[in-house]
Amino acid sequence: MFKRLKKDIQVIFDRDPAARSVWEVVFCYSGLHAIWFHRLSHKLYLRGWVLLPRMISNFARFLTGIEIHPGATIGEGLFIDHGTGIVIGETAELGKNVTLYQGVTLGGTGKEKGKRHPTIGDNVVVASGAKVLGSFTVGEHAKIGAGSVVLKEVPPYATVVGIPGKIVCMYGEKVDRGEDDVDLRHDQLPDPEGEMLFCMQRHIQLLQEKITKLEKELKK
């Protein structure tokens, strides 16, 4: 038990440069607290308990802002960074050394029963705000970009970004999709709100030009 707790703490030191001391990690890292609470609730869930595991899960959500269903299966080495808003569904399965950032959802589509949440392979990174929805597999060493919405299977060593998610890299090499597209990095993801505002601004500008033209014609 203590060996596993020690490993949980070491994972944070390995992946978070902001970690300064063991006591800071133990008392101040909500992701670690969520994992510990889940470990307890999951054991009870596997023994056939229903209410108590859900109560523990709800208390953990209140304390940490992270919601992990007691039925979710989580491998060793999970690192949750800035975990507020993370949701992990009942039938989700996480492999070893997975990294999740704030706002990530590993959820279902609302249309399925039974296995309805994603399976995340070993060493996968899911960046801030990404949504992985459905009962498919995200292959080992894959990366999901911030704000992406992934609705279908991701092969190993792929990098996926955008809405809906598209593969832009495989094994670290850019994928040529035959499109005049930019190389979508973390700092170059699409901005739907910005694009919408730009379109509205352009539309208003065109209307103003038409009004000006009509006013000139009426004055003649």
Stretches with model-predicted labels:
Residues 1-59, 175-220:
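Terminal amphipathic alpha-helical/low-complexity segments used for targeting or macromolecular assembly
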Residues 61-168:
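Structural signal for interior beta-strand "rungs" in well-ordered beta-sheet cores
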